[in-house]
Every structure is written in structure tokens, then in C-alpha cells.
Amino acid sequence: MNKVYGSAKEALADIVKNGQTFAVGGFGLCGIPEALIAALRDTGATNLTAISNNAGVDGFGLGQLLETRQIKKMISSYVGENKEFERQYLAGELELEFTPQGTLAEKLRAGGCGIPAFFTKTGVGTIVADGKEIREFDGEKYVMERSLVADIALIKAWKVSIS
């Protein structure tokens, strides 16, 4: 498989499908893969689940995919700066799974390692734990978090190894 492509559009051409889950790198609006997000938008794929620490802003980052209504669910730790996200969520048009930032990173790490779930104290006693298994270890309560595995990961890089 050739891992070097001439454009973001070319890189996504044969791998993007409706209903996929994709993870997006960056933090806030820093280091986000703008070209890949635009290329994903241009594929027209729908019913996507986005894993990202934020929902972008109107017209930028994941905001582009929200404006075209391609995202059906967000798994995120922060969504507060996107008016279109807010509109869709409050209208019941968009699913949201809030996940604390550290837990989000661990869910992706665990998924990449083949670990299906893990327990954490983060979120115990909050809405984050609603509907999730709670167990007690050594007198402390922990919430079980299911790992995340994306179909596609979009990252921004300056330099990569082609091997």
C-alpha cells in the first residue's frame, strides 16, 4: 500500500464510507488536519461519528462537517465554541458523548492496544457515569469506560517516515 499521496483528497479517495468513525488529531484549533477535514467534507460521506477533543468552530475544523450535516455523533471533551453544533444538539439532530479529556485519550490508547474497556475514577458521580458500570475497588468507586477504535484517523504532520 502506498502511504504517500499527492493530496488529502487522494489519500481519502478509496477509504471513506458512510457510517464510519474517525478520530481527529489536534488540540482545540491547533494542529488540526485542515486539508484532510476539507477532503472528508468533499467526499460527501454521512452518518459519521467524530472522535475529537472539540467540535471546531463555525466554518473551521470539524465545524465544516457539522455545517454539511455529515456528523451524526460527536465523542468529545469540549464542544462549547460551535454555534452549529449547539443548534443541532439542542434540536436533537446530533448525538453527543461527553468524555473527560484524559479519559478520551485513554479510551483511544486502550482501543489501539486491543484493550476493550478499563476502570477510572474520573466521572464517578457525574453525568459522565450515567448508564455505565460502576465497581468498587479497595473502597473506591470506579466507572467502566469502553475503549474507542476509529476506522480512520486524521492527523496533521510536518514530517513522516515513508517506511
Which residue stretches match the model-derived regions?
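Conserved alpha/beta enzyme-core scaffold
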Residues: 1-163
